[in-house]
């Protein structure tokens, strides 16, 4: 399994993850954000590129690897492979960061839902956001109001090209 998808794996050619989207996530009143997209790997790769270029703290959780920094591949959170341990770490961590989760549907059950509700309602976790990325993000009953939803539709049409030093479609 590829732990850190690269931006070269992009099939859409579209840049979705921009500093404006990052700011929208950081400034969101909700601590839980869902990005609904059919291109989850591309979105994760673009978050990685943003983290590398800007130095922002963006982390990615995978079941087989736990929480890992997208900015520095070698930085991992020990003991975070289980979803509940990762959520506890996020709840207790004093560090700012955006935590990305994909393929999380099977983990949306107790005790994880309790931890997610705690994170969503807590004001002490300000600056730490959990972002679910994928096309099948169905939150348990009553949790939809705790999540800010962002939709990403891949643009169909001409691929961008460079003209006079600017990208145009």
Model-assigned labels for residue ranges:
Residues 2-169:
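ATP/nucleotide-binding catalytic cores
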């Amino acid at each position: 399994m590829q732990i850190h998808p690269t931006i070269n794996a992009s099939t859409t050619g579209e840049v979705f993850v921009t500093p404006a989207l990052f700011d929208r996530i950081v400034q969101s009143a909700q601590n839980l954000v869902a990005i609904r997209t059919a291109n989850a790997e591309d979105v994760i790769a673009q978050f990685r590129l943003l983290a590398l270029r800007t130095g922002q703290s963006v982390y990615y959780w995978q079941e087989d690897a736990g929480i890992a920094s997208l900015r520095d591949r070698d930085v991992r959170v020990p003991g975070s492979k289980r979803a509940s341990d990762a959520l506890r770490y996020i709840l207790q961590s004093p560090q700012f960061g955006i935590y990305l989760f994909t393929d999380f549907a099977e983990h949306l059950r107790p005790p994880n839902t309790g931890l997610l509700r705690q994170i969503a309602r807590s004001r002490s976790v300000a600056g730490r956001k959990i972002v679910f990325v994928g096309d099948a993000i169905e939150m348990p009953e009553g949790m939809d109001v705790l999540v800010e939803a962002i939709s990403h539709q891949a643009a169909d049409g001409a691929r961008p090209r460079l003209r006079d030093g600017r990208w145009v479609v």
